A protein has these predicted regions:
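N-terminal helix-turn-helix DNA-binding module of bacterial transcription factors
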Residues: 1-56
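Glycine-rich phosphate/diphosphate-binding loops that line cofactor/substrate pockets in enzymes
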Residues: 57, 173-182
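Alpha-helical recognition/docking segments in bacterial nutrient-uptake
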Residues: 58-172, 235-236, 240, 251
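Hinge/beta->alpha junction and helix N-cap segments in small-molecule ligand-binding domains
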Residues: 65-80, 98-105, 159-169, 185-232, ...
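Residue-level detector of anion-binding/catalytic polar loops
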Residues: 95, 143, 180, 211, ...
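Periplasmic-binding protein-like
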Residues: 119-125, 183-186, 217, 239-249, ...
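Flexible loop/turn connectors
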Residues: 230-336
Length: 336
C-alpha cells in the first residue's frame, strides 16, 4: 500500500502541507523538520521518496502575519489556504518561501531576513492586520497581494471572502425556516472578516424586517474552547435566548453548541445554529453543523495567480477579488 502524505504528517505531528513542501524540495521549511521527514521515510523503507538536488526556481514569499494569534492559528482553514498557495506556486514554476511575522515584536527587525533571499513577489496573509500594519511591507517595493483582508483606502491588490454574501445567505436560510428571533455569536477578537459578517447579518435582518436586539448579541472567543467557556459564563446568567444563532465561524458555533448542550438545550429542537467556513469540525459536530462553505484552497490559488500577473506586469490597476460562498445544509437548523 502506497505511503500517503497525510500518513507521514500524522506520524510526525506536522501538517500535510509541510510534508508536501519537503517532498517537492520546496523552501520555507526548517532543516530540522526536513531531516525528520527524511529520517522517517528512510525508516519506513521509502527513501526513494526523498527528493534530489534543488531546482533553481524563482521565489514567491508567503508572510503569515500574527498580530495576536487570536484567529490565525494551526487550523484546517489556514492549512487549506496555504496548500492552495503551494499548489499554484509549484504549478506556476516558482518556489514558495514561508515566513511568520509576529505583530508583538518590531516588524522592521523581522523584515531584515527578507534581504537574505531574493523573492519576486509577496503574498501577505492579512487576516489579523489593520491598515497601519501594512506600512512596513509597502517599503519593500515588490509586487504584493493582500490575502484574507481588504483595506478600502490602501492601494493594494486583495483576495478576500465575500463575507457579506455568506452572512446574508445564512440569515436568509434561518428566516426561510421561520426564525424571527435570531441571535449572533460574534467574535470578541476584531478582524475585518468578522466585521463584514456582522454587517451582512444586520443588513439581512433589516431586509427581512427584523432587528438584532443587544440581548441576542453574544460576544465569544473565536476558538472552540474559548467559545465554550465564554458561552458557559453567559448561560450562567440565564439570559433569554433566541430560537436560532448565526456564528462568526464554525469554531465559535461548535464551542457554543457544547455549552448549550451541557446547559440542557437540544440542538436543533430548542435552538438552531449555523456556522461559517465549513471546516471538518462542522461535519463532525453532533448534530452536524449547517454552515457557509468557503473555498479555502481557491483563495490561496487566486492570490498566487494575481501576484504572478503583477510580476509579469499584465495589469496596472489595483484589483479586489471576492471569492463567493454557499450554504451547506446539515442538521443543526430546524423549521419553526
Amino acid at each position: 500500500m502506497a505511503l500517503k502524505v497525510k500518513d507521514i504528517a500524522n506520524m510526525l505531528g506536522v501538517s500535510p502541507s509541510t510534508v508536501s513542501l519537503v517532498l517537492n524540495n520546496r523552501p520555507g521549511i526548517s532543516e530540522s523538520t526536513r531531516q525528520r521527514i527524511f529520517d522517517k521515510l528512510t525508516e519506513l523503507g521509502y527513501s526513494n521518496m526523498i527528493p534530489k538536488a534543488t531546482t533553481n526556481y524563482p521565489n514567491l514569499r508567503l508572510v503569515i502575519y500574527k498580530k495576536h494569534g487570536g484567529v490565525v492559528s494551526d487550523t484546517h482553514f489556514f492549512s487549506q489556504v496555504i496548500e492552495g498557495i503551494d499548489t499554484q506556486t509549484r504549478k506556476s514554476g516558482y518556489n514558495l518561501l514561508i515566513n511568520y511575522i509576529s505583530g508583538l515584536d518590531p516588524v522592521e527587525e523581522q523584515l531584515r531576513c527578507f534581504n537574505q533571499s531574493s523573492c519576486d513577489g509577496l503574498i501577505l496573509l492579512a487576516t489579523e492586520m489593520s491598515p497601519e500594519d501594512l506600512t512596513p511591507f509597502q517599503t519593500l517595493k515588490i509586487p504584493t497581494v493582500v490575502l484574507d483582508s481588504y483595506f478600502q483606502f490602501v492601494q493594494q491588490d486583495a483576495v478576500v471572502i465575500n463575507n457579506m454574501q455568506g452572512a446574508s445567505e445564512a440569515i436568509r436560510h434561518l428566516t426561510e425556516m421561520g426564525h424571527t428571533r435570531i441571535g449572533y455569536l460574534h467574535s470578541n477578537v476584531y478582524i475585518n472578516n468578522f466585521q463584514e459578517r456582522r454587517d451582512g447579518v444586520i443588513q439581512a435582518l433589516r431586509g427581512a424586517g427584523l432587528q438584532l436586539p443587544e440581548s441576542f448579541l453574544f460576544s465569544l472567543t473565536p476558538s472552540i474552547d474559548g467559545a465554550y467557556n465564554s458561552m458557559r459564563r453567559l448561560l450562567s446568567q440565564q439570559p433569554v435566548l433566541p430560537t436560532a444563532f448565526f456564528a462568526d465561524n464554525d469554531l465559535i458555533a461548535v464551542g457554543a453548541a457544547r455549552a448549550l448542550r451541557e446547559a440542557g438545550y437540544v440542538i436543533p429542537n430548542d435552538i438552531s445554529i449555523i456556522g461559517f467556513d465549513d471546516m471538518p469540525v462542522a461535519e463532525a459536530m453532533n448534530p452536524p453543523l449547517t454552515t457557509i462553505y468557503v473555498p479555502k484552497q481557491r483563495l490561496g490559488m487566486l492570490a498566487v495567480k494575481r501576484l504572478i500577473s503583477q510580476i509579469q506586469q499584465e495589469t496596472a490597476e489595483f484589483v479586489k477579488i471576492e471569492v463567493g460562498t454557499h450554504l451547506v445544509c446539515r442538521q443543526s437548523v430546524r423549521a419553526v
